[in-house]
Amino acid sequence: DDLSRGLGDVYKRQELWGSGTPGPTGEVSSFLASKNVVAAGADTWSYDVVPPIDLNEPYPGHQILLKENGIYILEAMSTGELAKDNVYEFLFVLGQAKVRGAVQMIINPIAIN
């Protein structure tokens, strides 16, 4: 289950919600930006490590991806079934509501294998 490191059953255990989360480092976010990705995401409630590794530079993924490169961040992705089925390649379809000025949006992504 190497692809799934996030929420799992935390939704069912509310005492763990917001208690901390793993995530990629700024170095990983810089690598993704160098590859000109459109979006990056995780199965955690925050893309970045929480609590931050460096309190002087919290949430480096948000700074590098969103602010500096305009790359979308997808959080709380449900990847457990993909990991369980060893699916590494799929068509990713993402529709979003058109809301002017929004900085966050509830989305309904689909992975088609």
Segments and roles (model prediction):
Residues 4-5, 42, 76, 93-95, ...:
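Generic beta-strand/beta-sheet core signal
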Residues 8-9, 46-48, 99:
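Solvent-exposed loop/turn segments at secondary-structure junctions
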Residues 55-58, 90:
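Short low-complexity, flexible loop/linker segments enriched in glycine and/or proline
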